[in-house]
Amino acid sequence: MSQSYINVIGAGLAGSEAAYQIAKRGIPVKLYEMRGVKSTPQHKTADFAELVCSNSLRGDALTNAVGLLKEEMRRLDSVILKSAEATRVPAGGALAVDREGFSQMVTELVTNHPLIEVIREEITEIPNDDITVIATGPLTSDALAEKIHALNGGNGFYFYDAAAPIIDVNTIDMTKIYLKSRYDKGEAAYLNAPMTKQEFMDFHDALVNAEEAPLNSFEKEKYFEGCMPIEVMAKRGIKTMLYGPMKPVGLEYPDDYQGPRDGEYKTPYAVVQLRQDNAAGSLYNIVGFQTHLKWGEQKRVFQMIPGLENAEFVRYGVMHRNSYMDSPNLLEQTFRSKKQPNLFFAGQMTGVEGYVESAASGLVAGINAARLFKGEEALVFPETTAIGSLPHYVTHADSKHFQPMNVNFGIIKELDGPRIRDKKERYEKIAERALQDLAPYLDK
């Protein structure tokens, strides 16, 4: 092959992982990232793998599908997981990170690799012949997005994604807050703002009547269920939030709680949780409160939450449009393009949803781009693993109804034999089998 390097376009979670996986296999990489010369409305820095939504990489237990995926990625030497572990902050049973520290570490590990050349410029054309991984994310620049859209025959979809506000912890009234993780799982890592029934009803009424920021497009609003704006959720029904981000189950009042409550109930009617957002513990985000309300409305409504009456918002919630491909028709299970075989795609644009899933797609695409470069057979991870089931799902789903997908046990191949009724035991067996089946792939 005349090509002496592989291109990776985009240094987000997927692109950073892809570049790292290619370089560790001894192949030079040209990693293109436009931030630094051109930014996006949602990004705040030029660092790689910047987290623009939550700072949580979700559950860490093997009985959680994303926890299994993370363990598989650790064993495959993921630079994203390596950086996350080094910058983690307390979050109960979840893996949450110091947002800035995490991105800075990914940037350093990737930039300092001797085989990776970082080029800060916007790419507006798709390479015709060079092996290239395109991982420009849901915020792909307009010029390149048009080329990708044309390459794929105009087939593509979109949904709207949102981020939650971040608050200065020193402006929270801690007399109205208690520290606890749900069901006391892990360390007591969340600040909990309890509400009485009347407080919740007043909050719900203010939320559903608050003014939203206008969209920049006349297209129909479509949301990914896992990142739905809190005001959209509230409009679905008065109790919808009580089964979502304001669920009180497992968050009983502490014995010394002196605030208002409904009678002698040991559990609040509703709870708003806040999660540590940086290593210093000076910033907290409101868990599950992604929003597209106008900034003034966010301050007015969210300051109704007990303890947040005088809260200072260091970042208000924002919403952006995410585009993704018709992967079932356009991509092979290795994330290789069916239309232009020198191209691989990775990240949210492929229809995987979530930080960890995006990085996992970059890992798979990077490994297979390297194998194509070396003239080796493509590597398809087994469907009994999380990292094999996710690419299989997004490339084999029904194209007519295809929507972004988080990793979950429902897409991993079922166990042989009679179905185990106990969910925890069943998930443990699936995880055990997954790690066994992954073992032969670790040195490839």
From Swiss-Prot:
EC number: 2.1.1.74
Cell location: Cytoplasm
Protein's organism: Streptococcus gordonii (strain Challis / ATCC 35105 / BCRC 15272 / CH1 / DL1 / V288)
GO annotation (BP), single: tRNA methylation
Gene assigned in the entry: trmFO
Major localization class: cytoplasm
Keyword Flavoprotein among record annotations: yes
Gene3D superfamilies: FAD/NAD(P)-binding domain (3.50.50.60)
UniProt-recorded name of the protein: Methylenetetrahydrofolate--tRNA-(uracil-5-)-methyltransferase TrmFO
